[in-house]
């Protein structure tokens, strides 16, 4: 009885398995006929391998639209810091986010639910990238603290966003004729290195191509809000290459130079005028003051040129320093003239004494030749008829000179008059120079620069 029961249960179990297998096969056949596929969800790793891995067929060495129209790459930059504008080397340093966007249809996807993928920077080696470089770059640094400062984002439609943080040292040829009241224009040029315009074209992003961090300030310059965007297509022997540029206008703030150069030199010039009020007999004081101001002005002039390049043209600060040195030197020469005039009375009296001595010698000589007093005839001249007449002097003796004190007073008054005139003439001349100087450089030339 038990044996029969076991056989019955075994037969029922086999029937159940056969029925279940038939049902599964029927469902698969029905699904295949109706076109339905079993649902499968790819893992992120499998999806990336399928999108740009070895099995995807994607080749990073070939640009999008190969043998077709050029790839349009839109660029924009965000300026984090702007500074270290150096006149001696004529360059500036800037820290930026460089963002490039282009479309690569080979990276379009629909199997993954997200609209965009933010990928690790290491994936940059697996995709094609534009060969952008900065044409006027003198030095550059990447940033990798705490990790590589790079961003890679791929959208469903194949749009690629590549962002990178850079610190650049860019050349900036400067015109220093109006220094330190100048406005400099510094450029940043983005160019393709290997792809010609048949393969690659750079364009500025239409919305916010150049952005500046809020509150960005420079030590000596004001960064103007107006930024000129344009194209700078380069023509070489190897072809025509795409290039875009942005021009930054930097207006120098002259507060530093006003305190360090203009005001000290102005005070030195005014100090040199103090000698006009010092007594002309105090030669050591006036000479020491004059020489000290000249040497100080020379040192000040040399210091103003220490931080500037050796250019062939004259700068505004050079004219100021040269004129200040000229006024200080003229004040020293003024005392030399005063001292010379005040001592002229001694030379005048010496010449008068010499003239008087010569006249006396001539009289003595004349008397020795025609003196007949020994014969009782006195000063006589012999004429043809043998008679003698009394001789009269040919040149009468000069009038006695004026009193020496009066002559001295006359020349001293002349010297004092020079000091008196200088007290008004020097400040007036310097004031006129200042009017012309500041009008020329601060108003006229400043407006000309802005028009350009």
Curated annotation (Swiss-Prot):
Residues with attached carbohydrate:
72, 103
Q: How does it sit in the membrane?
A: Multi-pass membrane protein
Provide the residue positions that the database annotates as binding glycine 2. Answer: 99, 163
Q: Detail which positions bind glycine 1.
A: 99, 163, 238
Which effect does the record note for changing residue 47 to S? In MRXSP; uncertain significance
Q: Which PANTHER family match?
A: NEUROTRANSMITTER GATED ION CHANNEL
Q: What is this protein called?
A: Glycine receptor subunit alpha-2
Give the source species. Homo sapiens (Human)
At the highest ranks, the source species' classification is: Eukaryota, Metazoa, Chordata, Craniata, Vertebrata
